[in-house]
Amino acid sequence: MAEEKEVVLTKEGLEKLENELEHLKSVKREEVAERIKQAIAFGDITENSEYEDAKNEQAFIEGRIISLEKTLKKARLMEDEDIRTDVVSLGSRITLKEMKSGREVTVTLVSSVESKLKDGKISDESPVGKAIMGKKVKSTVSVEAPAGTIKYKIIKVEK
């Protein structure tokens, strides 16, 4: 069996996953177990939608717990000294300028596990993440998008 790829996480990302796992194990598991118990009390479970819903939620929760445990098992905490400012790396905070519009956007490059575009965290596996990884300030990159090629200039790289 192939060795699983290491997942590099920021301190914030690691804490978020650990907190979610703890919440699922200590709160959500108990809540859904209680819902199943109540649904069984209604009687015949063959046509009991509350029971079915609770069992489906239980399966989802258990699947998410397994997924989080696997991710955390292969996780490595990104140290501050791992974040470079000479080139774009995981953990870098990058200011990009879209060449056509001149609009600037600042993003943080993180692993796919903790990416969240609305928080300005983009995945190193995304088209933009792949394009800027390892590049220096003043570099220009092209990103293929459904609407065509978008060109960005790297304005700033910081921790």
Curated annotation (Swiss-Prot):
User: Which terms does the UniProt entry file under GO BP?
Assistant: DNA-templated transcription elongation; regulation of DNA-templated transcription elongation
Coiled-coil parts of chain = 1-76
Sorted alphabetically, the keyword list is: Coiled coil, DNA-binding, Transcription, Transcription regulation
Q: Select a single GO molecular function from the record's annotations and give it.
A: RNA polymerase binding
Show the Gene3D superfamilies listed in the entry: Transcription elongation factor, GreA/GreB, C-terminal domain, Transcription elongation factor, GreA/GreB, N-terminal domain
Membrane spanning residue stretches: none
The keyword Ligase belongs to this UniProt entry's keyword annotation: no
Q: Which SUPFAM superfamilies match?
A: FKBP-like, GreA transcript cleavage protein, N-terminal domain
Which family does this protein fall into? Answer: Belongs to the GreA/GreB family.
Q: What does this protein do?
A: Necessary for efficient RNA polymerase transcription elongation past template-encoded arresting sites. The arresting sites in DNA have the property of trapping a certain fraction of elongating RNA polymerases that pass through, resulting in locked ternary complexes. Cleavage of the nascent transcript by cleavage factors such as GreA or GreB allows the resumption of elongation from the new 3'terminus. GreA releases sequences of 2 to 3 nucleotides.
Q: What is this protein called?
A: Transcription elongation factor GreA
Q: Which organism is it from?
A: Syntrophomonas wolfei subsp. wolfei (strain DSM 2245B / Goettingen)
Lineage per the UniProt record: Bacteria, Bacillati, Bacillota, Clostridia, Eubacteriales
